[in-house]
A protein has these predicted regions:
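Flexible glycine-/small-residue-rich
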Residues: 115, 206, 335
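Thiamine diphosphate
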Residues: 1-165, 304, ...
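Non-catalytic, usually N-terminal nucleic-acid engagement modules in DNA/RNA processing proteins
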Residues: 168
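Short, contiguous clusters of charged residues that form electrostatic/catalytic patches at enzyme active sites
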Residues: 7-11, 63, 94, 150, ...
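Conserved Rossmann-like nucleotide-binding pocket used by diverse enzymes
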Residues: 52, 229, 332
Length: 348
């Protein structure tokens, strides 16, 4: 049976409320269903003491949730749009992210922040941003960005049970996406990426809504004779470098795609790490696709023109496979001969 992203999130919250009396929901209009209807009916089922409306103050909501978590509850708060999670940053950065460290491991912080990100339907510059990189700069936070209904179900349940502060980012464009749910599937691990599609020529790394765009591009490129492996990061902090390394050692070419601006984005961090940790495996520079450094326009046609799309991924992959296999000096020798790691280990 097909379920929408919204229905799957509601089911996950419903089941966790039933499973653990410590789980509480709070946020603006949460008792009335929330801005997108994710929590609809949960207040009637579980009571207004556990599904609670709050004032329109992101800072206050986050502070209340932090206090509740310190007192033994497991709050799941909804910050309506990641654009306004900026108002929660003082508390998130200086309180939940720091308590375990500052207490020497004596305190945990089982707190989940659900928030909506990304451009969809002409919501304009103040309701369309992708600010996930703000959070991955903070030690002590976990950042999750699911790409399908089934992934959202499992990752949300894992986040609620994780025991650490989790920023759970839901792309608005995915809310109407439908998919099937395997009730017997194990819950995904926080910090573990998944190979969404296997391939051998190029590694295409994406997350959230961009995973679907990557899969569509990979399908078209297969008809052109290019095999693209698509990695769904799932968790942006921490990043699963082991899964990435296994793929890069097979394909030797990497493209990273996300909707956020390229400046200081997840792609920039990944490209730097791949370049330093997996340099010997690369036959071409790591390429990135993302938004230009500009606000998201209101006009739908301008919004579409700005956002990275299927065609952008096709161009980038074609550029990667069109390159010769590495710099000229590398092509004169087998891979084992130009590996500085091999040379260093044999010399030592």
């Amino acid at each position: 049976m097909q379920h929408s992203f919204i229905e799957i999130l509601r089911r996950a919250l419903d089941e966790e409320l039933a499973r653990d009396p410590a789980v509480h929901l709070l946020g603006e209009d949460v008792a009335a269903g929330g801005a997108f209807g994710v929590t609809r009916g949960l207040a009637e089922k579980h009571g207004s003491a556990r599904v609670r409306n709050t004032p329109i103050s992101e800072a206050a909501i986050t502070g209340m949730a932090t206090g509740a978590a310190l007192c033994g509850l497991k709050p799941v708060l909804e910050v309506m749009f990641i654009d306004f999670a900026t108002l929660s940053m003082d508390c998130l950065v200086n309180q939940p992210a720091k308590y375990r460290y500052m207490s020497g491991g004596q305190l945990s912080m089982p707190l989940v922040v659900r928030t909506q990100a990304g451009a969809a339907g002409g919501a304009a510059a103040q309701h369309s941003q992708s600010l996930e990189t703000w959070f991955i700069h903070v030690p002590g936070l976990i950042v999750v960005a699911p790409s399908t209904p089934a992934e959202a179900y499992g990752l949300l349940k894992s986040a609620i049970r994780f025991g650490e502060p989790v920023i759970f980012i839901e792309h608005k464009r995915l809310y109407t996406m439908k998919g099937e749910l395997d009730d017997d599937a194990p819950l995904p691990m926080i910090g573990k990426a998944r190979v969404a599609r296997e391939g051998s020529d190029v590694t295409l790394i994406a997350y959230s809504a961009m995973v679907q765009t990557a899969l569509e591009a990979a399908l078209q490129l297969e008809d052109e004779g290019t095999s693209v492996e698509v990695i769904d990061l799932r968790t942006l902090l921490p990043i699963d470098m082991a899964t990435i390394a296994a793929s890069v050692s097979k394909t030797h070419r990497v493209l990273i795609a996300h909707e956020a601006v390229l400046n200081g984005g997840v792609g920039a961090e990944l490209a730097a790490r791949i370049g330093s940790e997996l340099f010997d495996e690369l036959d071409a520079p790591v390429l990135r696709v993302g938004c230009p450094f500009a606000p998201i326009p209101f006009a739908p046609e301008l919004e579409r023109a700005l956002l990275p799309a299927h065609a952008d991924l096709l161009r980038a992959v074609r550029e990667l496979v069109g390159r010769a296999s590495g710099p000229a000096w590398r092509r004169r020798f087998p891979r084992s001969a130009w590996s500085w790691k091999t040379s260093r280990s044999s010399a030592g």
